[in-house]
Amino acid sequence: MSTAQSLKSVDYEVFGRVQGVCFRMYTEDEARKIGVVGWVKNTSKGTVTGQVQGPEDKVNSMKSWLSKVGSPSSRIDRTNFSNEKTISKLEYSNFSIRY
């Protein structure tokens, strides 16, 4: 069907005060509420990184949340998005925290 929305995949990295503030847990909750799949994890350089996949409008909602909202006690300085592309099918069945 041509009415089906295209699926998008995007990688992200969030900079600021995003570790030790429950950022990953809130990201997982928000992703499940919005209805996207992928993953999130802390990096050794103090950022949070991951990947989001889903219908384009839902991925855009998650990108906005990762750029502006975050967890209640986080401070997002900037969020970089990369490798944004259209995919034919989702590569994950849910959204998870990686360690």
UniProtKB/Swiss-Prot annotation:
GO terms for cellular component: mitochondrion. It holds the Pfam family Acylphosphatase. It is an enzyme of class 3 (hydrolase). Keywords: Acetylation, Hydrolase, Phosphoprotein. GO terms for molecular function: acylphosphatase activity; identical protein binding. InterPro entries: Acylphosphatase, Acylphosphatase-like_dom, Acylphosphatase-like_dom_sf, Acylphosphatase_CS. The modification N-acetylserine is found at S2. It catalyses: an acyl phosphate + H2O = a carboxylate + phosphate + H(+). Residues 9-99 form the Acylphosphatase-like domain. The modification Phosphoserine is found at S93. Its EC number is 3.6.1.7. GO terms for biological process: phosphate-containing compound metabolic process. It comes from the Eukaryota. SUPFAM superfamilies: Acylphosphatase/BLUF domain-like. The active site is at R24, N42. The keyword DNA-binding does not apply. Belongs to the acylphosphatase family. Its physiological role is not yet clear. This is Acylphosphatase-2. It comes from Homo sapiens (Human).
